[in-house]
Regions:
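Single conserved hydrophobic/aromatic residue that forms the stacking wall/gate
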Residues: 1-16
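Beta-rich carbohydrate-recognition and catalytic domains
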Residues: 46-99, 103-163, 171-290, 299-364, ...
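Short glycine-rich, acidic/polar surface loops and turns
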Residues: 359-361, 369-372
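Donor nucleotide-activated moiety binding/catalytic core segment of transferases
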Residues: 288-294, 367-370
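Bacterial Sec-dependent N-terminal signal peptides
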Residues: 15-52
Length: 401
């Protein structure tokens, strides 16, 4: 019995030893599983932040398309307007609605969108007028049935008829004066022009922005697309002054600069050869290889002046093969707040590209997200853009996320 008991004790000792060894192995397995789960979670987390991680801290990268909202404005064949130039009723927004300006008026977001009638076929062949739409939430809009800005029998008719008034951008002063830049198109020459308003419906046209600069030297030069420098003051986006002057970036092929003391008469800055000073140009092999066209009003931030712009991609070897040839994508650049002509940094990749079907079909099927309107509303930034020269859509950036 004693010998037998000894044998049993030895077996128990061996069994205990095996149990301990098994326990250690199990713990190691559990630890390995835990490490793998942690690694997977980390990878997933990095994946979720990949979009913003590849952009510098000065950029506003995370603009999101609100689900089930876009496009927010589409053509309407049921609205008619008596055109003072044709002296006839026209379906003024029957063909295309696109390229919107945006601002805030009386607590509501107001979008001024370019609308084309059905008078002809082809880009730039119809007459453009500006429609008015307002929204409480920046997403759902109520439209007026007639345009608020159009070619008329006024001082600007020779410069605006028959092509119309195109591609507006609008910003507001602290005392509530709305300043709009738009393109006058008489189908001979495009000119950047200025208009002002207190209510966004009744406008005073001031004519070409550069009419008086350098004794009228540039009044007949091709010009368009202006981004006035703005800033946030007490939650309101207003036109800013730098060194006692107003500043704007402008230009289609290149980004140029101009200044003003009254917001109506603008003086373009010139280089050593007396030509328009180029502060940003297209880059070979990039999404903006063909042109760099100014977008919505620029924003003065704690990092500098943030300019959102439109880049067009060249076809072939000179373009960026990651994006469709001739497509328009949205880029961002940072300029020095003390010297607005000094480019500090620039994104190598677009922060917003054509994705939805209506952004890749219409007048411009190569794909277009053409940004022109930017407003701060309900603690968020709303970016309004044209889709393939045919629709209007919105994207939202929440700076608190």
């Amino acid at each position: 019995y004693e010998i037998g008991s000894g044998l049993v004790g030895s077996e128990m000792c061996i069994r205990d030893s095996l149990f301990i060894t098994s326990n250690v192995k199990m713990k190691r397995k559990l630890q390995n599983i835990a490490y793998l789960l942690m690694a997977a979670a980390l990878i997933t987390s990095c994946g979720e932040k990949k979009q913003t991680a590849e952009f510098p801290d000065w950029a506003w990268a995370d603009f999101q398309r609100p689900e089930g909202i876009n496009p927010i404005i589409s053509p309407d064949t049921t609205t008619f307007f008596y055109c003072p130039m044709r002296q006839d009723s026209v379906a003024w927004e029957a063909s295309d609605t696109f390229n919107p300006a945006a601002t805030v008026y009386d607590g509501k977001v107001v979008v001024l969108y370019r609308a084309e009638d059905n008078s002809a076929t082809g880009i730039g062949s119809r007459t453009s007028r500006l429609g008015y739409a307002s929204s409480d939430d920046g997403l759902h809009f109520k439209r007026m049935s007639v345009p608020v800005f159009y070619p008329a029998d006024d001082s600007q008719k020779e410069l605006e008829n028959p092509g119309g008034c195109e591609d507006p951008r609008v910003a507001v002063t602290e005392d509530g004066l709305y300043v709009m830049h738009y393109t006058q198109w008489n189908r001979k020459q495009a000119r950047l022009a200025v208009a002002t308003s207190r209510d966004l419906q009744t406008w005073e046209k001031h004519g070409p922005a550069f009419a008086k600069a350098y004794n009228g030297r540039f009044i007949d030069e091709f010009s368009k697309s202006a981004s006035i420098v703005t800033q946030l003051i007490d939650g309101k986006q207003v036109i800013a002054k730098i060194d006692g002057k107003y500043w704007m970036y402008w230009g289609e092929k290149f980004v140029n600069v101009a200044t003003s003391t009254d917001l109506v008469n603008w003086e373009p800055m010139l280089d050593e050869n007396g030509e328009f000073l180029k502060v940003m140009v297209p880059r070979a092999g990039k999404f903006d290889s063909d042109l760099t066209e100014c977008g919505p009003p620029a924003i003065l931030t704690d990092k500098g002046i943030l300019l959102l712009y439109n880049g067009k991609n060249k076809s072939g070897a000179e373009g960026d093969t990651l994006y469709t040839a001739n497509s328009y994508c949205a880029g961002q650049a940072l300029f020095d707040a003390k010297d607005p002509t000094k480019l500090i940094d620039r994104l190598d990749k677009p922060f917003y590209i054509p994705e939805s079907d209506f952004e890749k079909s219409g007048q411009y099927p190569a794909g277009t997200v053409f940004i022109e309107g930017l407003v701060f509303h309900n603690q968020k930034w709303f970016l309004y853009y044209g889709c393939a020269d045919s629709r209007v859509a919105v994207a939202v950036y929440d700076p608190l996320k």
